Amino acid sequence: MTGKTLYDKIWDAHLAHEAEDGTSLLYIDRHLVHEVTSPQAFEGLRMAGRSVHAPDKTIAVPDHNVPTTEGRDDPKNMTEDSAIQVAALDKNAKDFGIHYYPVSDVRQGIVHIVGPEQGWTLPGMTVVCGDSHTATHGAFGALAHGIGTSEVEHVLATQTLIQKKSKNMKVEITGKLAPGVTAKDITLTVIGRTGTAGGTGYVIEYCGEAIRDLSMEGRMTVCNMAIEGGARAGIIAPDEKTFEYCMGRPHAPKGAQWEAALAWWKTLYSDDDAHWDEVVTIRGEDIAPVVTWGTSPEDVLPITAEVPAADSFEGGKVGAAQRSLDYMGLTAGTPLDQIEIDTVFIGSCTNGRIEDLRAAASILKGKKVKDGLRAMIVPGSGLVRAQAEEEGLADIFKDAGFEWRLAGCSMCLAMNPDQLSPGERCAATSNRNFEGRQGRGGRTHLMSPAMAAAAAITGRLTDVRELM
């Protein structure tokens, strides 16, 4: 009998029913909810006279719309639409009795940071959320992916989800990473290799020595961007780092339940004879600090490279490349490390954790933000913010000239007051560089927190290794 992948094992453990055409009904262990994709779902429950099937497994937190400045719990400081959505989530959480972390709660933050922090995300689970970056939770050996609003309602009502099984892809990062190379460089390099459609129809398992060497924060960064490579989900087999991270979290099992869970978690790995539909192998030593130059995450190159010419691409990509160059205001042949920036944003569900802030602080300590540059650091949760202040990181940021914000999605997306102006160029640690993603006409370059910190000092895209 052929062995199973980690994805196969979790799928089989949660399969409630499978039709002849492969359409399956999966049980869902955790349902994460935020203010943007949930209002219609809760209203659907009301109209049908239904309750939430498993309120103890449903967790809500406002993150996308909330301002990151003081006084943000006052609706007057939000846009009208944002205030309505946050108020709706507050009411729905109370009406339906689900777990809720309001803006006033220190535990509030980005949903994909709050879930792991509070121990809601555990190995072997199925986790869904009405948000495309739910794959973040795959770092724990969980099957986690985004769902649409109609599916949000379905999970609220039944704690199940209808779907078809994906294929298995293995992405192996062998060997060691060089100094200055991070998890963000891994995940962007993978997307640059496979393209944004390379993972379509697959669940990606990331493995190899370089992946195992990553902290849990680093693994979350890698899995977070699986969707940018087209995959349904990204996943990493749990190990001692995973178990240590989960132990003692507020909603992790305790005592005998912990021991029983741990015994099962240790079986969650891909068998040696498991079948892979696709395999991608990249040597860790070949990965360099990278930045994006265009308007797709696959438009990524080492910081030592030059802006590519549109005619260096093939087929239909020539037109797309030229459109990217025009939108980004770039000229082919320009060294990437000579591109001047206006703004630096460090945060998001990709890079808003304590390790990310430490990395940025290590570059910024004793230095100043370039004159005329706008720079902000937005912790991924209130607890991350408190820890950064306790460790003295916040003082480093403020002394350098960064704005020290409250937790939220912030400038990752233009759904709150933190936005770029037309033509404004940003070095960002977020996950998407689409046209208008950070604000209409805004120009986004994706990179690691350390690279963004380096850019803040020099005022241009910079090889962080020069400042280490």
Curated annotation (Swiss-Prot):
Gene Ontology BP, a term: L-leucine biosynthetic process
Keywords annotated in UniProt: 4Fe-4S, Amino-acid biosynthesis, Branched-chain amino acid biosynthesis, Iron, Iron-sulfur, Leucine biosynthesis, Lyase, Metal-binding
Disulfide cysteine pairs (residue numbers): none
Pfam families: Aconitase
SUPFAM superfamilies for this protein: Aconitase iron-sulfur domain
Pathway membership: Amino-acid biosynthesis; L-leucine biosynthesis; L-leucine from 3-methyl-2-oxobutanoate: step 2/4
Described purpose of this protein according to its UniProt entry: Catalyzes the isomerization between 2-isopropylmalate and 3-isopropylmalate, via the formation of 2-isopropylmaleate.
UniProt cross-references to HAMAP family, sorted A to Z: LeuC_type1 (MF_01026)
Name listed for the protein in its UniProt record: 3-isopropylmalate dehydratase large subunit
Organism: Jannaschia sp. (strain CCS1)
Record gene name: leuC
